[in-house]
Each structure stands twice: as C-alpha cells, then as structure tokens.
Amino acid sequence: MSLSAHEIRELFLSFFEKKGHTRVKSAPLVPENDPTLLFVNAGMVPFKNVFLGLEKRPYKRATSCQKCLRVSGKHNDLEQVGYTSRHHTFFEMLGNFSFGDYFKKEAIEYAWEFVTEVLKLPKEKLYVSVYKDDEEAYRIWNEHIGIPSERIWRLGEEDNFWQMGDVGPCGPSSEIYVDRGEEYEGDERYLEIWNLVFMQYNRDENGVLTPLPHPNIDTGMGLERIASVLQGKNSNFEIDIIFPLIQFGEEVSGKKYGEKFETDVALRVIADHLRAITFAISDGVIPSNEGRGYVIRRILRRAMRFGYKLGIENPFLYKGVDLVVDIMKEPYPELELSREFVKGIVKGEEKRFIKTLKAGMEYIQEVIQKALEEGRKTLSGKEVFTAYDTYGFPVDLIDEIAREKGLGIDLEGFQCELEEQRERARKHFKVEAKKVKPVYSHLKELGKTSAFVGYEHMEWESQVVGLVKGEGLVSELKEGEEGEVVLKETPFYPEGGGQIGDAGIIESDKALFKVEDTQKPTEGIIVHIGKVLKGTLKVGDTVHARVDKERRWDIMRNHTATHLLHAALRNVLGEHVRQAGSLVADKYLRFDFTHFSALTEEELKRVEELVNEKIRENLPVNVMEMAYDEALKTGAIAIFEEKYGERVRVISCGEFSKELCGGTHVSATGDIGYFKIISESSVGAGVRRIVAQTGRWSVETAFKEHQTLKKASSALGVGEEEVIQKIEELKEEIKDREREIQRLKQELLKLQIREVVKEENVGDFTLHYGVFEEVEPEELRNLADMLRQRTKKDVVFIASRKGDKINFVIGVSKEISDKVNAKEVIREVGKVLKGGGGGRADLAQGGGKAPDKFPEAVKLLKEILSG
C-alpha cells in the first residue's frame, strides 16, 4: 500500500480521534518552560508535565504529530546524519497517549489495528519485542492478538525499558517490527516502526520500582520511517517529503544521487539540514553563538560544508527553504507565514560563513597535514581554537573533518584556550567597569550636582562645584594636569543614547581647561574630562563654558540624519526594521538595525535618496515633552535597549519620523546639508549596520571618491564612465591567463609522469611509483586519482619532495581496494618515511620527514603487494 507522508499523518491522527483521542497540534520545537531541553526531541515532551502529575489537561487521551529535533545531549543524531539511511536531525513523531486512562491491552490493540487494517501491512511480516520480564505484554501479543511465540522477542532493559530520567516515571516497552525480506540485513531487514511505552512504575533514588496508581501510555512512530516502508523505499531520504530536497541538491551541485557514497552523504546532509533549519528558524530560533541559536548555526554550517565538498561555493541553502515550505506547508501553515523571513536569515548566515569557509577549510587541511607529517593522532587545542575562533567552524564540525583523516581533536586543550579568551574578556570588562568611581557618589552626597542646559545653549556662565583627579576630589587643578570638572550648570552634552559627549573650553579669569569628552557616570553628575592648558582652576571659580560649536553642529546633523535613516529604512525595507544600536559622532554616524539580508545596491540607493529628499524638503524638527505612554500612543518609536522615565522627549521630523530621544538635533532637516552612505555590513545574525556621513564630512568624502575615480581613469587610459568596464575586462584577461597557466601546469605534470613515474608488475598488481619535486598535495592527489584508473589492478605510490619534507599519496583501483587497503598501507610506508597518514581504502595521503627513504618505502610496498 503506497501512501504519501501527508496521507499517513492524517490517517494516524484520524484513526485515534475515532478512538476518543483529542488531536493536539504540534508544539513548537522550542520547549515551553523546560530549561532541561534545548529542543523538543520526542512526541511525549509537550505532555511531560502531564505524565509527571504537574499539569492537568481537559482530556485523558491525546494524539499528535510532533515536530522533533535531535541534535544535542543523549539523543544526538547530528554526526550520523548523512551516513545512514535512517538518522535525521528533524523528524516528525506520530504518537498516541493515555493519561491514566487505557493501558497495555488497548494500546496494543490500537497499534495492531492501525498497522494491519489501516496501513494494510501483512500480519505475517510483523514481529514484536517485549521487555523480558513483562509477561502481561507477552500474553496480550501472543494469546489476544495471536502472534506466534517465534515472532515475539524478549529483550533486556537496554532495548525495552524506558525511563524519563534516573528517577521518576518509567516502564517496559514493546516495539513493532516489519520484516522487509531476506535481501536486507540486520536492522534494515527487521525495521522497528512503532514503540509502545507502558509507563507503570516510579523509580526512587535507590532504584526501587513502585507501581503508579494510574499508569500511562506513550507511543511513538517515526513518520519518515513508516513512510519509507509503505512507499517501498530503501531509505527515509527517498520518501516523497524528503527526496525532492535530494533532487534540489543534485540540481545545485550538478552531482547525481546513487553514484558515489560520499556524494550521497553530502546530499542527504543537505536535505535533512534544510528541513531542520527551516522549521527551527520558523519557530523563532535565530542562528547565534550560544544556546539553541548556536545549534542551528552548527547545522547550517555543516550543510554548507558538505555543499562545499560537492563544489558549491556560493549561498544555496536559502533557495531550498522555498521547497521545504512548499512540501510541508499543508500540515504546518505557519511555514508559509515565515517563508521570506527564514530565507533572509539563512541567506545572511550563508553569506557570512561563505567568506571564511574556503579559508577555514584550507587552514584545517593544513593543520591536518601538519599533524600527519608529525605523526600526531590529534589536532592541538590551539589549532582547533583557531579554526573555531578565527574561521567560525563549530567544534564538532572540526572533529568530523579530522576524523575523516583518521585524527581526533584535543578537546581539553581547546577548552583551555577558550577559557583563556574568556578570562581576557573578563579582565577587559573589569577595566571598563572601573570608570564608575566612588568619588561620584561622594559628590552627590555633598549636593555637588549638575544641570544640563545644552538643548538651548552652547555657551553658559557657570560655577565649578567639583574637581576630580584620579580617584579623589581635589580643590584645584594646575597647568598641565589632567582631571575632571563638575559644573553647576553645563551646556556640554554628556555621552548617552548613542551620541558622543561634547568637547570645548571651560575658561575662568585665571585658567583655561580644554574639554576632550563629557560623560554622565551617574544620575545628576556630568563630568568634563580634559586638561588645564593655562593657569590654575579652583573649586568655586566662576567660568565661561563654551562647547565646540562646529563639532556640536556636526553631531546634531548626524543625530537628526540617524532618525531620517531609521524612517527611510522602514519605508524601503519594511516595518520589521528596528534600531539595534547606534553611534552618533562628529565625523560619521553608525546605525545598527534588524534585517535579515544585505541591502541591494538598489535598496541602498533608495534609502539614501529618500533621506536626501527629506533634507531638501527642509522639514521642521520639533521637540515635545510628554508622558511615556502618551508618546507611544502618538506613534513615536521607542528603542528597545533604552531605559525611559515617566516623561520623555519626542523628536519629530515633519510627518516622516517620530522617535523618543534625549539627544541634540538641528532645527530643520535642511541644516543637515547632504547625507551619504559610506558602507553597509553585517554585525550578527539578523542585524545590519550602515555607516554614513553628513554635512562637510560627506562632501569631503564625495570629493575624495571623485579624485580617486579621476586617478583610476587616468591610470587605465579610459574615460571616468568606462573605468568599471575596463576593470572587468582586465579581470577576465587575468582569469584567462590563470586558466592557461593551470592548463600548462597539467601538461607539464603529464610530461613529468612519463619521466618520473615508473611502472612495474608486482604480484597481481600494477605498481606506479615515483618522486616529484615541489608538487602541491592537491595536484599529487589528482595525479594518483588519474593513475589508479588506468586498469582495474593499479596501485599508485607517488610523492613530492620539498626540502627535508615529503608528501605522499597511495591510491588503488576501487576494484582491488578490498585486497589492498590504501589507508592501512600508508601507515606502514609512512613509518619508513618518518611520518604517517590516513584516508580512505582507495585513496590515502600522508607526510614525513625522510624523503631520502622513498626507495626503502617502495621496497616495503612491493613486499606487501607480493604477499
């Protein structure tokens, strides 16, 4: 009986609904109120508190098809995914549950009825297992259902006894298997399709089992697995809801499924991981460097790495998101709602990692080669940390790559390196924290506070109420001394809300103090940080405080422009854009915002043009003070990270922009002059950054760029409008020449083969051997690959000498790899060359420190082949 996965899912849920079960919608992949789990990894997880007696539901019978993710902890299938036909990270679990209602007899009856009468599986092909001491379950299967004893297996605690933890609810289980025929072996012949858990005991701290007053039922049937049986497929990856993703991988890579094991592994990884990241991100898990986000980033980067192995060097996974959504949106309509968001996040992640993927792979291959040459069995903690920290490779991915070459990783050493980095960060944090000094609290206690008058004034007559030098209060600061000045009132704006502090001059009759920065270390205290240029400044002096007006005007232009930029981004990109951080300086502004992908040239152009349009309109910039709640009702945008009091300032630029803000601004947008975007980049998952300039600084940058264009035009000998075209032509010329160089290299190597490589018949094999001078390891592998395919009995042993180092490759025809194992042989010859190696049965590589020993290594190889 061939049924689609969607049909099987619906048949299951409908069947149990008819048996009095309430259909429960799948919970999100992120467990609710369960800090013990990163992800829902079994069908029973959403009902965990019901089983524990901590929660009551309005039903005693339930059925569900639960989204699951197994990537961490005890149930971690990540490293197996791709290498087997059954392991997945994401899968769906069909289940029926009883909370103190029916028990073994009904659970077994329902399961048997569903598999034999609804799914029409032949009874004679079905086997069951029971816990060795569960006589009740055995009798029900044997006497009530009628399964002969030879098709009932009694298994031990490891296979057929389930427990939630070391203590708590537990009980025996029973599994249903289908016999797929003699052409299959082991687990693939007798395939487990359904697990019935009879939760009838409570285990205490001493391991003592006590019967539960109301036993429960928890069953689980993997949808992908039962679909493979009903659709007659050899692998879960070939069923109707997954195989289109394999085909997607074929399409983007140009490789064919079923022709080569390594290709199949990569295509299965891509298919599985696409499902996992699509569902996880749709459920709100954004890739990051910690917790659930890090797990999803690991999955995504693992898929990218396998794509890279297939020759895919550009972002591609985001394109597959559409396919996952199209296949799965019928049972999970929420996928359609988040389609574009998921694609954007995935594409952004790919673009970030693709920049370091190639360099990271080269680095890892380099340290693997070094380890092999040195005869080490592991990559050092420092090497692993560099791959992790510099290139962004998850540790388990580094471990997987190393194991492919027969190496391990020094996990303990890696943890030490990681802890050292964290300690450096902690020390840095402690240094930063010292900025808040007890002296400021003392000033407040003395009533020596400051009032800010800088919204209306840039100059102000004031009085010195406090002087700080180092960690304490002083009565005076002399010429040449650095310190901090506290004024009764000040026009100097202290750093806050992303805006840098003002600079300027504080002058008395007898002293001149240069203000380099202004800070507000605690509420009510504004400190002017700088140096006495002339005379002596004393507490109680009357002073004239004068802000650097030109600098302040630059800052105000940038701050108002930041508001215009925020509004323009929301206008062009959508309402999802939110401020995620900002820096308003004098020479530039920096604005971080939420968005899932890099802005296109067209989007950047539209944003820049819209801001400049609003500048030309010379919109009035109005400031209003009002209650916080009232401000939000008017549509003013609040910044998530900021803390607001009951009264807030609302800055409006005409009808175009309205935000809560405590900074200083121009009085009309025309005062900004000109706005120019300098750069757009990523600062993290789902967060972009724009750096821009205004006023005189933007004009200066535009002038410099034009000067650069003029110089490029002159150097290339073309008009300014033809510079890009000329550069593209030159790039193509370089590519053509590089291709020609590669072609000539290959021709040269072929000529060298005739001169360098000798051929001898040894035993039943044809041996090709020789030493080249300074040939790259990759070219050496390619040569070995070519030579081992000449006949069906080729053994290749070629090497490349560079100084006192030697790299070498052993390759054998696939047809004889069961007789001559390259991976085993390379270890033996590697010893002679004072090194080692690893790889596959048909192709292995290594390195050593004794190039002069190559003839001896050849002699040993001949002895091995002669048998």
UniProtKB/Swiss-Prot annotation:
Any Pfam family the entry gives: DHHA1
Keyword terms of this UniProt record: Aminoacyl-tRNA synthetase, ATP-binding, Cytoplasm, Ligase, Metal-binding, Nucleotide-binding, Protein biosynthesis, RNA-binding, tRNA-binding, Zinc
Cofactor(s) for this UniProt protein: Zn(2+)
Cell compartments where the protein resides: Cytoplasm
The enzyme's E.C. designation: 6.1.1.7
Binding site for Zn(2+): H559, H563, C661, H665
Chemical reaction(s) catalysed: tRNA(Ala) + L-alanine + ATP = L-alanyl-tRNA(Ala) + AMP + diphosphate
NCBIfam families cross-referenced by the UniProt entry: alaS
Official protein name in the record: Alanine--tRNA ligase
